[in-house]
C-alpha cells in the first residue's frame, strides 16, 4: 500500500493557531486532551464485554440513574470519568458540565484553572451499547466569564448558559468500524480518523460540506401519533414519494444515536428531527440544548447545513437551565428551511385529529 502523508490533529491545530498570533496554546492543548479522552473511550467501547464494562452501572444494587432520570450504563459512567480525568489537570479549564452530572464540575484546587469551559455528553446513544451499534461522544467549548477568571471563584450554572453562537469549538467522536473525530473551531468542519497503529487522529475528511438537497430523513416514527401538524405534513410528503407533492422518493433512517445520525448527514446529507410532541407535554423536547443541540448546530452551520428549533436558528436560543431540553431539526439546508416554513404557515385544525391544533412543536 503506498504511503499517504496526512496531517495529524496536532499539525492541523498548529496551522489553525497561526491565524491568531497572540494565542497562548491553551485551546490547542484542551482539544488534544479531549481527543485523548475520545481515544480512551474508543478503546473501552471496542473491548466491549471483554473489558467488563457492559451492562447497567451498579446493577447489583438496582442500578443508577443520572440527572435526566435515565438508567446509566457502565460505559456512561466510565466515559464521564475519562472526560474529567483527561481534561481537568492541565490548567486549560475553569470548569465542566456533563449530561451525567447534575451540577457543574469544579476543577480541583490542586490544579490550575484556565479560561475555557467544556460541556459534553460523554457517551451518546448508550442504549445501543449492548447490541453493538454505533455510539459517540459530543462536546462544546465555551469561554468562562471574565469575572470568574478575575476572582478565581467557582463556576455556577449561570456561567454555562451561553447561546450557541458563543461556542469557541464543537465536535464529536463516533465509535464505529473506525473511530472518527469531527471538529469545528469556527473555520469549517474537518474529520480525523484514528490510526490504531500510530495512535494519532489523522486528517481524512477536510472541509466537510453537507449537500443542500437530500432524499433521506431520520425521525422516530413510533412517536407519529404524538406529532403535531408541521412535522406530520413533512413526513407524509416524504413518504408519499414520487407520486406525492415532493415528486421524489425518500428513505427513512433511525439509529437512536444523535452523533451517528449527525455523522451520516455530514457525510452524505439528510435531515434529522427530534421534535417536541404531545407525548409528554412537560418536556419541551428530548435532546439537551447545551451539550447536544448546540454543538451539532455549530457543526451543521459550519458545514453549510442548518440547525433549528423550527422557529429560529438553534444557535440563537438563549439557554435557561443547564440540562434544558429542546426540539431539534438539523441537516441539509433546503430541507430544514422547508420544515421551518411549515411551522410558520398557519395550520387548520382537523376535527378528527386534535393533535394538529397547535402550530409548532420545536419550541424551547
UniProtKB/Swiss-Prot annotation:
Binding residues annotated for Mg(2+) 2, in chain numbering: 121, 124, 292
Residue runs in coiled coils: none
Molecular function via GO: fructose 1,6-bisphosphate 1-phosphatase activity; magnesium ion binding
Enzyme class name: hydrolase
Catalytic activity: beta-D-fructose 1,6-bisphosphate + H2O = beta-D-fructose 6-phosphate + phosphate
Cited InterPro entries: FBPase_C_dom, FBPase_class-1, FBPase_N, FBPtase, Fructose_bisphosphatase_AS
Keyword Magnesium: yes
GO CC aspect terms: cytosol
Pfam families: FBPase, FBPase_C
Cofactor(s), by name: Mg(2+)
Residues reported in the UniProt entry to bind Mg(2+) 1: 99, 121, 123
Highest taxon listed in the record's lineage: Bacteria
Gene Ontology BP, a term: fructose 6-phosphate metabolic process
Binding site for substrate: 124-127, 220
Subcellular location: Cytoplasm
Keywords annotated in UniProt: Carbohydrate metabolism, Cytoplasm, Hydrolase, Magnesium, Metal-binding
CDD domains found in the cross-reference section: FBPase (cd00354)
Pathway: Carbohydrate biosynthesis; gluconeogenesis
EC number: 3.1.3.11
Cofactor binding notes: Binds 2 magnesium ions per subunit.
Subunit structure: Homotetramer.
Similarity field: Belongs to the FBPase class 1 family.
Name recorded for this polypeptide: Fructose-1,6-bisphosphatase class 1 1
GN (gene name): fbp1
Amino acid at each position: 500500500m503506498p504511503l499517504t502523508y496526512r496531517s495529524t490533529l496536532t499539525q492541523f491545530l498548529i496551522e489553525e493557531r497561526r491565524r491568531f498570533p497572540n494565542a497562548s496554546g491553551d485551546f490547542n492543548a484542551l482539544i488534544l486532551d479531549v481527543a485523548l479522552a475520545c481515544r480512551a473511550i474508543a478503546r473501552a467501547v471496542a473491548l466491549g464485554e471483554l473489558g467488563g464494562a457492559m451492562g447497567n452501572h451498579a446493577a447489583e444494587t438496582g442500578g443508577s440513574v443520572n440527572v435526566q432520570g435515565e438508567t446509566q450504563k457502565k460505559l456512561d459512567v466510565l466515559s464521564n470519568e475519562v472526560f474529567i480525568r483527561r481534561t481537568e489537570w492541565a490548567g486549560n479549564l475553569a470548569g465542566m458540565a456533563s449530561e451525567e452530572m447534575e451540577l457543574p464540575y469544579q476543577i480541583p484546587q490542586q490544579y490550575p484553572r484556565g479560561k475555557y469551559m467544556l460541556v459534553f455528553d460523554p457517551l451518546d446513544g448508550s442504549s445501543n451499547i449492548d447490541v453493538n451499534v454505533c455510539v459517540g461522544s459530543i462536546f462544546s467549548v465555551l469561554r468562562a466569564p471574565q469575572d470568574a477568571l478575575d476572582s478565581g471563584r467557582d463556576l455556577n450554572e449561570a456561567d454555562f448558559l451561553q447561546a450557541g453562537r458563543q461556542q469557541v469549538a464543537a465536535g464529536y467522536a463516533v465509535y464505529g468500524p473506525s473511530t472518527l473525530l469531527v471538529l469545528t473551531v469556527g473555520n469549517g468542519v474537518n474529520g480525523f480518523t484514528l490510526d490504531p497503529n500510530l495512535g494519532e487522529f489523522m486528517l481524512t475528511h477536510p472541509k466537510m460540506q453537507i449537500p443542500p438537497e437530500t432524499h433521506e430523513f431520520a425521525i422516530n416514527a413510533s412517536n407519529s401519533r404524538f406529532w403535531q401538524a408541521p412535522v406530520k405534513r413533512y413526513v407524509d410528503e416524504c413518504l408519499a414519494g414520487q407520486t406525492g407533492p415532493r415528486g421524489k422518493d425518500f428513505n427513512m433512517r433511525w439509529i437512536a444515536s444523535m452523533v451517528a445520525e449527525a455523522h451520516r448527514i455530514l457525510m452524505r446529507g439528510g435531515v434529522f428531527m427530534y421534535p417536541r410532541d404531545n407525548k409528554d407535554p412537560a418536556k419541551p423536547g428530548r435532546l439537551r440544548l447545551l451539550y447536544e443541540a448546540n454543538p451539532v448546530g455549530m457543526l451543521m452551520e459550519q458545514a453549510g447545513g442548518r440547525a433549528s428549533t423550527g422557529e429560529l436558528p438553534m444557535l440563537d436560543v438563549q439557554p435557561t437551565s443547564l440540562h434544558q431540553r429542546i426540539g431539534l431539526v438539523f441537516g441539509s439546508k433546503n430541507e430544514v428551511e422547508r420544515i421551518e416554513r411549515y411551522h410558520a404557515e398557519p395550520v387548520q385544525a382537523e376535527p378528527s385529529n386534535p393533535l394538529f391544533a397547535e402550530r409548532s412543536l420545536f419550541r424551547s
